[in-house]
Amino acid sequence: MENKSRYKTIDHVICVEENRKIHVWETLPKENSPKRKNTLIIASGFARRMDHFAGLAEYLSQNGFHVIRYDSLHHVGLSSGTIDEFTMSIGKQSLLAVVDWLNTRKINNLGMLASSLSARIAYASLSEINVSFLITAVGVVNLRYTLERALGFDYLSLPIDELPDNLDFEGHKLGAEVFARDCFDSGWEDLTSTINSMMHLDIPFIAFTANNDDWVKQDEVITLLSSIRSHQCKIYSLLGSSHDLGENLVVLRNFYQSVTKAAIAMDNGCLDIDVDIIEPSFEHLTIAAVNERRMKIEIENQVISLS
């Protein structure tokens, strides 16, 4: 289902089992921009919504990409469910549903960008979907380590019955028991499980790390890449950045530039990101961000009026 509005961003709704809905935002390539082979899916990091990536969508659109974003089920944002029921497997289910929906629309040439926690979900999903390439930014490779750094304690070391009701993750209440059970039952928790998901990867892969990232160890990212047998992969560092890629405008612009360059390079079958890009103006980015925030509020108000 497509929701038409006055905004350039197009809101779609995917209906999945149990009458749940996933909101998907579509940004078309700008007129007269370069032609690209692949549509790019953006999987937002934990506690990040689609509209948080308005600027990146504008960068990619200006450079010819058809861009798809979505809010996961049981997460922050517009899709169904509450974050206290979020699990990594629900994140994976959401990603697979979006890819399947795109395939039904005959959109089959896909590249993927996943950041932070969504990168771990992408790593586990690649054997079940067809994508041309993968880009990750501050991608989590060792979930247990990242959670310990983010939460200040290794909660996955505790027996299930000793866990608190909720874990406070960046101001959001994550249901401790449901999340931990899923981590262990579905094998999400450590670096070894990530390596096992990725060792047979046969598509190009670029991983962006941040040199001031306290939540992801760069040497573990290097270990992951060295375990991939195809060797179609490369690592780049976002200098001056922490795990929060939006901490200031300099870091944010570097992130936008770097990812856009990587997408162009990989769309052309290359891992070298020394390519030219078209940069939107700051005013253009601001307008896009404001419009998407308004659009989000309007959609939320529509849901409230129907309830």
UniProtKB/Swiss-Prot annotation:
Signal sequence coordinates: none
Annotated InterPro entries: AB_hydrolase_fold, LuxD
Top EC class of this enzyme: transferase
GO function terms (MF aspect): acyltransferase activity, transferring groups other than amino-acyl groups
Pathway stated in the Swiss-Prot or TrEMBL entry: Lipid metabolism; fatty acid reduction for biolumincescence
Enzyme Commission no: 2.3.1.-
Superkingdom of source: Bacteria
Pfam families: Acyl_transf_2
NCBIfam families assigned to the protein according to its UniProt record, in alphabetical order: PRK13604.1
Its biological purpose: Acyl transferase is part of the fatty acid reductase system required for aldehyde biosynthesis; it produces fatty acids for the luminescent reaction.
Family stated for the protein in its record: Belongs to the LuxD family.
Cited HAMAP family: LuxD
Protein name per Swiss-Prot or TrEMBL: Acyl transferase
